[in-house]
């Protein structure tokens, strides 16, 4: 399916829950993948993050945003999120 292809291409993250691959609902909106998520995943992957580490980072509250990175992406603050992700690489 299209979702499986997006996971394979690195545009989405999925994890196993009770043996079934799932994509967090917050990664999607009415138009598809949340704007800025694929680029953020690429930056984190290039910084050496595992899929588990990326999921944890995206859902961990960052008081400087405020909120979690995925919440910031969902409210169109992708540049701030991407800057923070890039800073992790150094």
Give residue spans per PLM region.
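Non-transmembrane "mature" sequence context
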Residues: 1-90
